[in-house]
């Protein structure tokens, strides 16, 4: 990733690009200066020249170079912070294997072998890392940096849908011992059937007389979650979270400094609550994730699968069915109502 520029006026420039005496210059991995274009050219022209120069470097170099270029591109920066962080994590697994290889020499069978080996320890992570590989290759193929995407046609492992349903007793056990920030986030996630990232990014401007406006980060669906007494109480609890003197926060779920919680920062508080609940309630199994609270919300909703889909914001009922985990009680023979 590119570091901060000494001159803020140069912050728009691509990585490894600098102002020369008469032209913008690109520094190769070998620290050789490659002329891009004159200093009179537009920023867009500099980026085009940069991508061409890096593309030529990729062709004669490695998958590491291709991945570096993707991860400093505008396309990468347009991804959500969580996705960028995940991709950075996945790159740490795949680059030791493919990093020094010419990307055009990586074939589908190489991807398959990686998947099979990685799948021994985690099939889910193997799928995620293959998706990262495919994203890098697709990005490079669209720009002419590689000849093909070797991930195409390589099957992912079948993932078994999670079936864990959080009971009211288990939910209340964690809520009982949790810090207020965790309590507020739990309630909003459950009541609004919302993802953790959408809860942590909630801003004060999303609160209205009608309810809480949420634009789902994954599907892009926009909804206003209508007020109930319980949702109002959760919002009030969040707004009462402590702040340092003189500080105001733009975020509903905020730290004392006023800044939003990162995923890792909040998960640390979440783990603390779960551990405390397990100690206080040893007869319960506190093995659920924060994301399972969304599934609990969908499972506890009344109505048909289609009605639950409309409330959840999923694009199809198949997605909603994955989250609908409560075991249905059905009549036996002779017990049906007329």
In which residue ranges do the predicted regions lie?
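C-terminal catalytic core of tyrosine-transesterase DNA break-rejoin enzymes
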Residues: 124, 184-187, 191, 198, ...
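Active-site/catalytic core of tyrosine-dependent DNA strand-transfer enzymes
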Residues: 228-284, 297
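Short basic/aromatic active-site micro-motif
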Residues: 106, 263, 283-302
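Short, polar N-cap/turn motifs at the start of nucleic acid-interacting alpha helices
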Residues: 206-209, 304-324
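Conserved tyrosine-mediated DNA breakage-rejoining catalytic core shared by Y-recombinases
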Residues: 14, 161, 165, 169-170, ...
